[in-house]
Structure formats: C-alpha cells, structure tokens
C-alpha cells in the first residue's frame, strides 16, 4: 500500500486524480495539500474537502497550502477550463464549509509519522512543495519519492509555446523542487497529452460505476470536455493530466523513462520552459522523466479503478 501526501489545486483533473487515489486498492491518501492554481486556494480546499466528504473519508486532513507563487506575480485562474469554483458547474454544499482545514505546519507531522514510507504526488503549482523543502529539508529528503505532473520536453507547451501550466505558474518553485528532490519522477505533457478519456469510455464508467462520486462525475466531465473542444475542436476527449502522475506510482510499467538533470527558465520569453540534455552523449542521471506511455493500459486501469 503506497501512502500518499497529495499536493494539488482541484480543479477537475486534480479531482479525478484524488478520486482515483481514494478508490485504488494500492493507494492510501494520508493528506491533501491544496493551493492556488486552477482556482483560488479557498475553492481548492473546499473541493478537496467535498470529495473526501462524498467518500466518507473526513479522517484525511485537508491542509491549506500556498496562496500565491514565489514569483509574486498576479495569478491567472482558469474558470473556462475548470469552472468558477473548480468542479465545472458544481458548487460545493454548505456542509463542506464547516469541515476543518488544517494549517500548513500539519505537513511536518505527516512527514515525521510516515518517513521513508511516504510518497508525495504533486499535480499543481509547486509553490507549497518548494516551501516544504525550505522549512523541513531533511524530512523532505527522507520521503520515498516525489511524483510530479508538469513540464514538457522537446515538444510544445500548453500555456505558452514553450511552457506547461504548472511549471509556468511558479517556475522558481519548480526549480527548487527539481534541484532538491530525491527520487523525483516527472510526468510531462509528453505523456499526459496522450491520456485521453473519450465520451464512450466515460459513459461506460458512468453506466457501471458504484463509486461514491457517481453523481458529480458526469457534469464535471461534460464541462471539462466542452472546454477542451473549444480549444481544440478535433480532440477526442479531455486529458487526464493529473491522474497520470498518481497512476505512475502504482503502474510504472505503463511508462518509458529516461534519467536527466532538469532545469527551468524562470523569467523572460522562455519563462516556464523545462529543459534537459537529450543528446546521445548526455549522462543518464537525475530525475526520472516519463517520455512514453501505454495509453491503452493507462485508460483500462483508470476505468477499472473508477468502477
């Protein structure tokens, strides 16, 4: 059983990643750290709390993370992709607002409690993770591994021609994580752009699912797919970017990896660009970067888990 401290900014695809983690028999989520990103930090916290409420897992703490990037730039949110509060057309019920949100220092107790048995999955801006490295460096270096969704290598970005949204949102934080993390696994757009959930696949899940999220999945999916169609009318379905990283934790055989030292541009026209040396003579060291995915096996496992 993989014990996971989840960092994210839910967000529709973050929410599907949390659902996947709660339902997967090999994953135990022990805490969720929410911050700004797809939506404002307070909506992200309430969305995570709502998902936990639906799952009857209020024993899992929701921890308040970063409210703005280390770059101190004005944050751009994405209501056209994720909805005004982050769950598409869904508004969390009033009962969620009374669920306690824990302070950032609660991360330290989780790091101490689980130590080398803890894996961190980060699928949002890396601000909270970078702050955790600055506050509790020894404890952070002691975790089993860090699984990060973000970046892109040798392909185009999704928020600029060069940059992926999570890294672009706080490249200084991403740089801190890339430089300090031990046993870092990166799942960039190279693989997440292939994690397409078509309407037929989703309809099968919806028709056969008995999971506690059944009532909210369809409006979330429909909103998300509609947003993607406006950006790319030929797309076959929305992309499960964030699910890829947490799936990779328990399904490493679905991916092909290379090891490279990763860097990121932090300002200027190339802000948020991730890069590494992929020349034939380059040294195989540093982060483990997923560059290929068996999308059929990934989707089959996602469907099986969500039923």
Language-model-derived ranges and their functions:
Residues 5, 29, 56-60, 216:
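Generic alpha-helical hydrophobic packing signal
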Residues 14, 82-84, 128, 241:
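Histidine-centered active-site/metal-ligand motif
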Residues 45-49, 53-113, 286-292, 307:
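Metal-dependent C-N hydrolase catalytic cores
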Residues 76-83, 160-164, 202-203, 279-281:
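Short, surface-exposed amphipathic charged segments that create phosphate/polyanion-binding patches used
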């Amino acid at each position: 059983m993989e014990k996971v401290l989840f960092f994210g900014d839910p967000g529709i695809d973050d929410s599907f990643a949390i659902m996947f983690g709660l339902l997967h028999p090999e994953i135990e989520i022990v805490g969720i750290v929410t911050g700004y990103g797809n939506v404002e930090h307070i909506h992200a916290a309430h969305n995570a709390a709502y998902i936990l409420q639906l799952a009857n897992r209020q024993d899992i703490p929701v921890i308040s993370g970063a409210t703005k990037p280390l770059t101190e730039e004005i944050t751009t949110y994405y209501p056209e992709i994720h909805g005004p509060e982050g769950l598409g057309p869904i508004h969390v019920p009033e009962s969620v607002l009374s669920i306690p949100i824990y302070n950032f220092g609660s991360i330290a107790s989780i790091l101490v409690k689980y130590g080398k048995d803890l894996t961190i999955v980060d699928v949002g801006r890396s601000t909270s993770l970078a702050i955790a490295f600055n506050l509790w460096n020894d404890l952070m270096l002691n975790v089993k591994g860090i699984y990060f969704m973000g970046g892109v290598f040798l392909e185009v970005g999704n928020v600029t021609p060069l940059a992926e949204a999570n890294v672009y949102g706080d490249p200084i934080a991403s740089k801190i994580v890339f430089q300090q993390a031990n046993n870092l696994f990166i799942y960039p757009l190279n693989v997440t752009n292939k994690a397409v959930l078509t309407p037929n696949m989703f309809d099968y899940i919806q028709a056969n699912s008995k999971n506690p999220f059944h009532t909210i999945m369809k409006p979330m999916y429909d909103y998300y797919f509609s947003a993607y169609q406006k950006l790319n009318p030929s797309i076959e379905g929305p992309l499960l970017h964030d699910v890829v990283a947490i799936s990779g934790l328990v399904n490493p055989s679905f991916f092909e990896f290379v090891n490279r030292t990763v860097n990121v541009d932090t300002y200027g026209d190339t802000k948020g660009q991730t890069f590494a040396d992929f020349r034939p003579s380059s040294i195989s060291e540093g982060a483990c970067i997923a560059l290929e995915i068996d999308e059929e096996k990934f989707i089959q496992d996602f469907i099986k888990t969500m039923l």
